[in-house]
Amino acid sequence: MRKKNYKGRITKRYLPKCNDICRTYDPIMTAYADLLSKREDIDEYRCNVYLEGLTEGDYTTDFLIKKKDGTFMVRECVYRSRITKPIHYKLLELSRSYWLHRGIVDWGCVINEKK
């Protein structure tokens, strides 16, 4: 989950199941986008989906994914070292409640592997 107008290093790529140009901001997002493109149960996905109506600010969710069975799932990418920090916890909880309010219960975090 990032600010809508995030100013940082960005990688832009065309990927098979992504509806638009896939913009990734870190290695976790890049690796997960590649994984989604290879999975057979995924129909399509969108990166950096704007969370409209948040009073806390303008934020985007990392991945909104549509499966072949028509259900949706949401994934947020976060580094293991940052997941326990209060601001990141607050933002992840905002994302989870935002999507739960819209009927998407399959919400989760993508975390880098333990070293």
What is each of the regions a protein language model found here?
Residues 1-115:
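Electrostatic, structured charged patches in enzyme active sites and in nucleic-acid/phosphate-binding
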